[in-house]
Swiss-Prot record:
Keyword annotations of the record: Ribonucleoprotein, Ribosomal protein, RNA-binding, rRNA-binding
Residue numbers spanned by region Disordered: 1-25
Disulfide bonds: none
Pfam family, one: Ribosomal_S20p
Record HAMAP family: Ribosomal_bS20 (MF_00500)
UniProt keyword Aminoacyl-tRNA synthetase present: no
Organism: Paraburkholderia phytofirmans (strain DSM 17436 / LMG 22146 / PsJN)
The keyword NADP is assigned to this record: no
Recorded GO MF terms: small ribosomal subunit rRNA binding; structural constituent of ribosome
Gene Ontology CC annotation, any one: small ribosomal subunit
Source superkingdom: Bacteria
Name the UniProt record assigns to this protein: Small ribosomal subunit protein bS20
NCBIfam families recorded: S20 (TIGR00029)
GO biological-process terms attached to the record: translation
Length: 92
């Protein structure tokens, strides 16, 4: 248990930051799942539209250092490749 005033304040701040960061990490995962769901449905236009919105969300969360920028880029790249592959498989 924190005894000094500054230790109590740091504990409060850490709890608040943890709660906020957890919500943003959840938003990150939800954005990825939304695109994956559209890709699995096979609707390229809808998947591309959702990817645009999710891409912004992913970038914002990476800018806040909730996830590393390389992790965000990796997820965006894989989602974009999956959408592009969806177009190729639909054409064949």
């Amino acid at each position: 248990m924190a005894n000094s005033a500054q230790a109590r304040k740091r504990a409060r701040q850490a709890a608040k930051a943890n709660s906020h960061n957890s919500a943003l990490r959840s938003k990150f995962r939800t954005a990825i799942k939304a695109v994956r769901k559209a890709i699995d449905a096979g609707d390229k236009a809808k998947a591309a539209e959702i990817f645009q919105a999710s891409s912004k969300t992913i970038d914002i969360i990476a800018d806040k250092n909730i996830v590393h920028k390389n992790k965000a880029a990796r997820h965006k790249s894989r989602l974009a490749a999956a959408i592009k592959g969806l177009q190729a498989s639909a054409a064949q």
